[in-house]
UniProtKB/Swiss-Prot annotation:
InterPro entries: Ribosomal_uL22, Ribosomal_uL22_bac/chlpt-type, Ribosomal_uL22_bac/org-type, Ribosomal_uL22_CS, Ribosomal_uL22_sf. NCBIfam families: rplV_bact (TIGR01044). It comes from Natranaerobius thermophilus (strain ATCC BAA-1301 / DSM 18059 / JW/NM-WN-LF). Pfam families: Ribosomal_L22 (PF00237). Belongs to the universal ribosomal protein uL22 family. It comes from the Bacteria. The gene is rplV. Disulfide bonds: none annotated. This is Large ribosomal subunit protein uL22. This protein binds specifically to 23S rRNA; its binding is stimulated by other ribosomal proteins, e.g. L4, L17, and L20. It is important during the early stages of 50S assembly. It makes multiple contacts with different domains of the 23S rRNA in the assembled 50S subunit and ribosome. The globular domain of the protein is located near the polypeptide exit tunnel on the outside of the subunit, while an extended beta-hairpin is found that lines the wall of the exit tunnel in the center of the 70S ribosome. GO terms for biological process: translation. The keyword RNA-binding applies. One of its GO terms (molecular function) is rRNA binding. GO terms for cellular component: cytosolic large ribosomal subunit. CDD domains: Ribosomal_L22.
Length: 113
């Protein structure tokens, strides 16, 4: 049995989010939350929120044991890019691309033995 949580259109670059998500893949939920709280990156807040949501989904919707949960899958997909322009000298303008991400975390119960 597995429980899943997603956050879509998060205003964080997918590259920066993947850097953080790679640290927690395959880890126990408690260990992953500890890593996220001690990592000084901007992407940790939304990722922590998704991990907690997946944990709550597992407990409430599937009656899984919260102590035996681990992150079986977690990945970041690229969302749409918000395109903006910054005015520059001599009537020019340069583009600013604000990237978004879709975060997905899947948790499973660890088998005893």
């Amino acid at each position: 049995m597995e429980a899943k949580a997603t956050a879509r259109y998060v205003r964080i670059s997918p590259r920066k989010a993947r850097e953080v998500i790679d640290m927690i893949r395959g880890k126990n939920i408690e260990e992953a939350l500890g890593i996220l709280q001690l990592t000084p990156k901007g992407a940790t807040k939304p990722i922590e929120k998704v991990v907690k949501s997946a944990q709550a989904n597992a407990e409430n919707n599937f009656e899984m044991n919260p102590d035996s949960l681990y992150i079986s899958e977690c990945y970041v997909d690229e969302g749409p890019t918000l395109k903006r322009f910054r005015p520059r000298a001599m009537g020019r303008a340069t583009p600013i691309n604000k990237k978004t991400s879709h975060l997905t975390v899947v948790v499973k119960e660890q088998k005893e033995g």
